[in-house]
Amino acid sequence: MRSLFPKEWVIREYTADYGIDLDVELFEECNDGVYITKGEHILFQVKTTNDIEVKDLKVYSKTNSDNCIFKVVKYPLDTALLATVEKMGSAVPVLLCLVDNVEREGYFVCLNDYIDKILISQKPDYDRQGTVTINIPIENRISSGTVAIEWYGKRAKLYSFFNLVNCQNRDLLYTSDCNLEQMVEIFLNRICRLDIWSDQRLKLFKEQIDYYIEHHSTKQADIIINDAIERGENVDEPIWEGTYCMGEVSFRHVTQIQELHRLWDQMCIISDMYETDYREAYLPTYYWSVVNE
């Protein structure tokens, strides 16, 4: 396993056999030859074999109207381990890695996600069995899967982001519009300090945040306001009443306030998308097959 990971990653072995074999801590290079920890950990359950057998797995869509084929490696896993992983929740990824001793390659699948997205829906009483066969896509190779593993490593930080923006969103609902700008500045400063922005799925939101920090208005609000100005409307006359605003305010003000709240609403939706869709990444599911085409 050590030879398959980047040399800067630190691997700690658990000597007692409680189902988890390795704690892999991810590091990154800060300057020439110097590495620092990213504060990201992934747990591994490692199995080995001298005889990898690749099989076809037919997977159907939710409506059973279409299907796809995955090339997988099957491995029987004790349900006691799966039950332990399920109790852990999904914040700390536990990856099953099957190592081919002949080809010196490892194949992985995230057990937390496999349980939630596949196993419980197909076998809700799986814990009554002695073992469950896990289907590991052969595309999930350790040697070429650094990006995927680093994505799993960000999970705890992403969950922290989800909790933070949801809490901030509730606070903003009870913040008067006269105090909103000061509160938003504090909130955005906190969000920007989170180590999550290398995730390409968040690129659009980081661009919107950077735009607000520079212009003190969201990009969408400026588009709406400029369109109104081009139509000859007076955007600064206080004749409007709007959601989140007290008394009569200008079209400019009400638009900036409403679009700012919309930005937080959109950031909160990311957590729903992550749970519903993104956690199927690298799993043998129809959704991942379609997304990965």
Label the predicted regions:
Residues 51-80:
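Mg2+/Mn2+-dependent nuclease catalytic core
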Residues 37-39, 59-65, 111-114, 125-129:
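Short intrinsically disordered coil segments
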Residues 1-62:
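Catalytic centers of nucleases
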Residues 72-159:
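Mixed-charge intrinsically disordered linker/loop segments at interdomain junctions
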Residues 17, 23, 56-58, 118-120, ...:
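Generic alpha-helix signal with a bias toward terminal, lower-confidence helices
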Residues 149-293:
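Long, low-complexity, intrinsically disordered terminal regions
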Residues 31, 50, 64-67, 101, ...:
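Detector for Asparagine
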Residues 2, 82-83, 185, 206:
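Generic detector of well-ordered alpha-helical segments enriched in charged/polar residues
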